[in-house]
Amino acid sequence: REAMALQTTELERAVSLLRGLDADQWTAQTNCPDWDVRRMWLHVLGACEAGASVRENIHQMRAARSRRKAHGVPLEAGLSAVQVAERDHLSPAQLLHRLQAVAPETVTGRSRTPSLMRSMKVGVDAPVVEKWSLGYLIDVIYLRDMWMHRIDTVRATGGDPVLSGDHDGRIVADVVAEWAQRHGEPFTLELTGAAGGSFVAGTGGASFTMDAVDFCSVLAGRGEATGLLTTIVPF
């Protein structure tokens, strides 16, 4: 499926990026207040290991629910905290080794989720309060999360992200489609850069021109937003 092909490519790009970081870059503060680069990728590693193992997934969800009950935090925040805390002993080299090793198993595990399970609804409480199908979580959210954290890492450490229309452009187009569905208003959107494109819905609506990555960052809560750009799209 396309979703798993995109996740395979995203994991490859993530590993390539992390392989090139020096010691100072691993400790660079990201725009996620609780995380430097290493801790951000401990979270991603945890998500990948949960995708590769049903047992690990069940363990993480149980621990996250306990943390939510104990600390009154959203389940998503509790899950991320568990993923980081249980891997915080890993050095950057160990983290990278484990991520490389688990990457193909993650894609295989997620791709084998039965259709009946994919249709099951799961409640989420951040950044929106609604119910998602498990298939949406597996195919869309896990991909967007990895992609945005790759962008976060580049912005924390300097340089430019590796972007292409067939990969990043596809992710951005999917974000635009969901954004349009969530606000339901007419618009004209011109996204620049390798991941960009032109998008129009209806007539007479608001008009935007901006970098494609910046657009996604704003919708993910990583920048100032006004008008239709205040519409939350989960990452």
Predicted regions, residues:
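Short, contiguous alpha-helical
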Residues: 27-70, 121-182, 215
